[in-house]
Design a protein with these regions (language model features):
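Intrinsically disordered, low-complexity, positively biased terminal segments
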Residues: 1-194
Length: 194
């Protein structure tokens, strides 16, 4: 089912099937709140035919909060694992929303990929991100973390403040504030696999 706005522009969809009074959601995508409401109205229009709605939420958004009167069970299960394989290339391609006028030094610990284990300087020139491995990064603008933490932070799974608070990330408080602005809010969604 596709949700269209008043101008007949598609803004979301739900892939589903009905079986034994269960509405099975295979995939649901809404580009804005209007589409989200429209899709859920469509699903609720089937309530006379079903007892249960089952599906997966790839966004990590707590669904129970969105429903005023719902009896809902939510389970959190890892769906996909991620790992930064090449930190230097990752930094070069990352869509940083702003470009500070100073270098940030990342001290990365990676016991499985020696090319990632070490210090990296990241800076911006002429609208481009630059990155290179350095020997003994200075303590100024230093962020120290392991590759797992870097992956979780850069992909939006955990915010820098959370990682700092739980001692997965070591840095000065001013750098923590910069990281919070430098890393976009939101999580990538891999709703299909190969």
């Amino acid at each position: 089912a596709i949700y269209y706005n008043e101008k007949h522009k598609p803004l979301g969809y739900v892939v589903y099937y009905l079986r034994n009074e269960v509405f099975h959601i295979k995939e649901i995508v809404a580009l804005n709140s209007e589409a989200r409401h429209g899709i859920w109205n469509y699903i609720s229009a089937h309530k006379s035919m079903l007892n249960t709605v089952v599906g997966f939420n790839y966004s990590g958004e707590p669904m129970a909060f969105l429903f005023e009167d719902s009896e809902m069970v939510e389970n959190i299960e890892p769906y996909i694992m991620a790992r930064i394989v090449d930190a230097e290339e990752f930094f070069l391609e990352y869509p940083f929303p702003l470009q500070p006028d100073f270098k940030i030094h990342f001290r990365i610990h990676d016991e499985h990929a020696p090319w990632n284990d070490g210090d990296f300087a990241v800076w911006w020139e002429d609208g481009k991100t630059c990155c290179r491995r350095v020997e003994d990064a200075p303590d100024v603008n230093l962020v120290e973390l392991n590759i797992r933490t870097l992956t979780a932070m850069m992909l939006g799974y955990k915010r820098p403040s959370y990682l700092y608070e739980h001692e997965y990330l070591k840095t000065e408080y001013y750098m923590l504030q910069i990281l919070e602005r430098l890393i976009p809010v939101g999580k990538p969604c891999f709703s299909d696999n190969f």
